[in-house]
Amino acid sequence: MAATVPSLARAEQAPLPDKPFAEHRVVLQLSDNDPRKQGLVISVANNLLKFYDPDKVAIEVVTFGPGIDLLRPDNTNRKLVESLVAQGVRFDVCLNTVDSIERETGKRPEFVPVATPVQVGVGQILTLTENGYTLVRP
């Protein structure tokens, strides 16, 4: 089942993840729809979870521009994304991008229900880095 992302007017920047015991904080940027890059982002998140205990690392993947395709219901990586979310990784979808797609196509795209809508993907990255997250662009 897919979820339609709310409009920009109703969304806010997502609050920081609640990971009180996290010793490491990483934000992964995904801004293109290259399947190899999608796989690399998923691999980096998986490797971080294996290297650190999932309770010891906060991981947030921020998608914007063509990178939001990772969170579409028909993406081949859907089960991997859902598995990572079950382990505490958060996947954000940029609503500026969603609104642009809707203006261009006349249809609002759907995303996996585990996607967290944020108003501005780059703004979310800035908020996270200002709060101790390390930005990684695989």
Could you describe each region identified by the protein language model?
Residues 1-3:
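N-terminal export leaders
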Residues 8-138:
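Secreted/extracellular ectodomain signature
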